[in-house]
UniProtKB/Swiss-Prot annotation:
This is Large ribosomal subunit protein bL17. Keywords: Ribonucleoprotein, Ribosomal protein. Part of the 50S ribosomal subunit. Contacts protein L32. Belongs to the bacterial ribosomal protein bL17 family. GO terms for molecular function: structural constituent of ribosome.
Amino acid sequence: MRHKIKGRKLNITSSHRQAMLANMAVALVTHEQIKTTLPKAKELRPYIETLITKAKKADLMVRRSVLSKIKDKTAVEKLINILGTRYKDRPGGYTRIIKAGFRYGDLAPIAYIEFVDRDINAKGNIQQDANEEIKN
């Protein structure tokens, strides 16, 4: 019986699952919207929401705690400095999941997970900067 067992297995090992959630959290913090399967999005939501709730404090202990989870310094900086201040007055519910149909190959349910008050320009900034460097 699965009484009081939280989370989904996603048919992968626990270390793979933790690494996948950390990588997806970095991608979500960087781009503020990502497309993934619906079960992965549902697993990512509580993971990222606890990180944002911690980041609202913005002290050294929180910085180290968040860095131990996601292991990317630029994502931690953005999480604490930008997202922590953006959601300072919001008591929770920082993300939304939007269902986006089914994947063509295997009919897996696809969803977008995004921040509620996201910066629309955040998704394209990295590609625009890369294109400018190539032209120069």
